Amino acid sequence: MNILITGAGLIGAHTARQAVDGGSKVVLFDLAPNREYLEKVVGKGRADVVAADMRDLPALISALDRFQVDTLVHTAGLIGKRVAENSYTGATNNILGTINALEAARLRKLRRVVYVSTFGVYDRAKISGSAVREGDAVGGHNLYTVTKLCSEHLVHSYTEQYGLDTIIIRPAGVFGRGHYVGGSTVGMIMRDLALAVVKGDPFTIDAKVYAPNEVVYAKDVASAINLACQVKNPKQRTYNAGSGVVTGPQDLARIVKELAPNIDVKVTGASAEDSVKSSPLDLSVSKAELGYAPRYALKEALRDYMEELWADQRN
């Protein structure tokens, strides 16, 4: 496959790495690509990079033509609180960017578009099951999730109206080796924690910030996306991508102590041992139809993440 990935951040870079490893040709399309970061994650010269704005439809179409792209993965956009910090910029980046991705794919008759949404679109107040399924209730509760849900509707509309082959991936809270520029609370907490362990520094987990949550390693999300690019004749168009496990701050502290017994890790602001826990994502359909199964439990993910950070420190 010839794949164009919009967004060269945490998810985009790891998706590119795995796609290249699998034999695909990859181009990353990003407004301000961090080339040093991409060299570390993807590898030097292993993927082409185009510095351009998702809101520039002609630039996107030009990139599709130049690199003879047949598959588009759309990860670009502002995340989390960054959308609310400038609502106009956030909305135009996230919604217009999705429209441009879909329109470019339609005009160039691409074989598939994979849109990366978020598990934040689920309306937890209306879900009572032990695990969250793809068909459960959705609803936007902040500007970020509204833009993602709006984008999902656009994706479905292009499939229904134009026959565009699309798949939506809804990942849990993603963490891993990334150049965080703000917005991802989970990602930044995990980064700060991993860096503290690597440096041998004490670390405090604020339970009011890191509430019970499902987190998933970027390498697992990248696997789900690449599987979505490859699957033939999918039975549905939306798939969860998580770890299938909800962890609280005390769980996180315990795992860190197992990995690094000499590190001082404290939890503050904890309620009655995280008594209110959200349900994990149901991964049964993703496994059955995509072949997705997370390879990294949280402990293994943190170990792998720290090993990469240690390697960066040595270099």
Label the model's feature ranges:
Residues L143, T147-C150:
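Active-site helix of classical SDR
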Residues G12-A13:
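N-terminal Rossmann-fold NAD(P) dinucleotide-binding loop
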Residues H74, I99-L143:
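Conserved Rossmann-fold NAD(P)-dependent oxidoreductase catalytic core, especially the SDR/UDP-sugar
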Residues D201, I205-N315:
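C-terminal substrate-binding subdomain of Rossmann-fold SDR/epimerase-dehydratase oxidoreductases
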Residues H156-P212, A218-A222, I255-K257:
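NAD(P)-dependent short-chain dehydrogenase/reductase
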Residues I3-G7:
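Conserved N-terminal Rossmann-fold NAD(P)-binding element of oxidoreductases
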Residues G43-D56:
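Rossmann-fold cofactor-recognition segment
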Residues M54-N93:
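NAD(P)H-binding glycine-rich loop region in Rossmannoid oxidoreductase-like domains
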